[in-house]
Structure formats: C-alpha cells, structure tokens
C-alpha cells in the first residue's frame, strides 16, 4: 500500500512567510502598499500581518520612511538553534 502525503493549508502562515521572504530581497525595505502589490494581496490583509510580525519582532517599521525591513530576530533564532546542537 502506497502512502500519500497529505497537503494541509495554513494561509496565514504562508502570508507571513511570503512577507518575510519578500523583505529579505531588499535592504531598503518595502512600504505597506508595495508589499501588498508584490504579494497580490489587499492592503488591509497585509496590515494585519505586518502588525503581528512587528509585535513579534520579526520585522521593523522605520517611521522616517514608512518602510518595513527584516529585524535580526531570524538571525538570532538561527544562531540559538546552531549553538544548542551538540557536534
């Protein structure tokens, strides 16, 4: 008997990861409208995701130019993971 892999959907998680991956493409960051356009999503939909990502410190909002950028949290998580593994 062949086992088939079940595909599960987690749209909110995918949206958040899409935002993180997009922000990784530019050191200048993106405005909320640019993120929505690039990801083919509504501005309201992106707004909610951005607020959560900022509150969890995965991304930062620059009030001077109103652009979102990645924070160093992902780097810190990767570093923590690599130091916790024994060689």
Regions found by a protein language model. Give the residues of each.
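N-terminal helix-turn-helix
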Residues: 2-84
